[in-house]
């Protein structure tokens, strides 16, 4: 299976970013995945210290392991994601998307990479979501299902 690149979007939350990266590192597929970190710019001068600290944490934990793309001004989350996901889909044909406040399970990358491969030719699927709202009737089934909406807490697309 060809692994999708990971797009990690970070801003000004140093401890969240640290926990997110540490959780990703516990996924076995992480070591063989391409990683792009999109670091948004400060909204105001008061954001600069936290934005700088986030970038330092990325360097400390990942070193040259990640391709760090630092915005010089604040793009905002939506624009940053649209640009980053678009660029990576154009280059690789698929992408796994993580924001800086997610703590993923060790099988997160396995699930999303497998689903990208399994559903890649299925026109009904536009996105694979790693998060599922707690619906009591579905919990015992613990399986993937088709839903008419998306979630943004860890996802993948083509």
Sequence positions of predicted segments:
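An acidic/histidine-cluster motif and surrounding catalytic segment
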Residues: 1-97, 102-157
């Amino acid at each position: 299976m060809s692994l999708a690149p990971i797009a990690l979007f970070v801003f000004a939350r140093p401890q969240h970013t640290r926990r997110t990266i540490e959780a990703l590192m516990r996924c076995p597929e992480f070591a063989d995945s391409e990683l792009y970190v999109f670091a948004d710019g400060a909204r105001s001068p008061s954001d600069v210290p936290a934005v700088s600290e986030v970038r330092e944490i990325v360097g400390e934990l990942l070193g040259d392991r990640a391709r760090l793309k630092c915005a010089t001004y604040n793009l905002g989350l939506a624009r940053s994601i649209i640009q980053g996901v678009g660029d990576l889909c154009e280059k690789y044909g698929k992408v796994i998307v993580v924001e800086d406040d997610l703590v993923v399970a060790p099988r997160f990358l396995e699930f999303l990479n497998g689903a990208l491969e399994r559903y890649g030719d299925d026109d009904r699927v536009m996105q694979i979501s790693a998060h599922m709202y707690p619906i009591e009737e579905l919990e015992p089934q613990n399986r993937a299902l088709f839903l008419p909406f998306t979630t943004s807490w860890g996802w993948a697309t083509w």
